[in-house]
Amino acid sequence: PGALRGLVQALPEGASEARLACLHRLWDVGSNDRWWAARTALAELETPRMGYDHDAAAVKQWRKRLERAQESEERAWEELSHPTYFSHIARHDLSEFELGEFQAELARCTPIARAWLVRKNLREHPQRRAYLLFVELPGMDDEDRYELCRSLERTLGLPGPVLALWAGESPTLQEIRRSAFEPVFSR
């Protein structure tokens, strides 16, 4: 799947048919890239080009695919963010390099006292790398903690989606210590 995605991105501007063929193959392998494939195919089909006729059937097919892929992505996010945070988790799977980069990112975020990272095994996308990040943020009010967690979700360079949660009412610091393995970062 990664090679097909790279090929689609590397094909020249005029290679619309080849790009669409690769996107069909990417969709057919049932990969985690279906949402991307559908959006890219629709962008390709909806871009007016000299010498190409509008293919209404293909646009309709890719719109349906995009809708299915979006529903799948929503189910995956619901599963990741469901309050049974500690079910279907495993130790993080980051390489030493990835972990070092991640720890450097956390070190730049001064409010974080400690952090735990676990991999969440998603039933919707079992091959996808998805993570839960639990952070201890002493001395902050809940509104600021919430904003910081959303910011971490957008900016951290993890190889998959991440849901950031602070130690508090749910989950509690005790639950995190008991279930999230050892901290990956400590100040």
Task: Tell me what each language-model feature is.
Residues P1-S16, C22-D28:
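Alpha-helical adaptor scaffolds
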Residues A3, Q70-G168:
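A contiguous, surface-oriented mixed alpha/beta subdomain in the mid-to-C-terminal portion of proteins
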Residues L11-G14, V29-R34, E46-R49:
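Alpha-helical junction/boundary sensor with strong preference for TPR arrays
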Residues E17-D28, D53-L66:
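Alpha-helical repeat scaffolds
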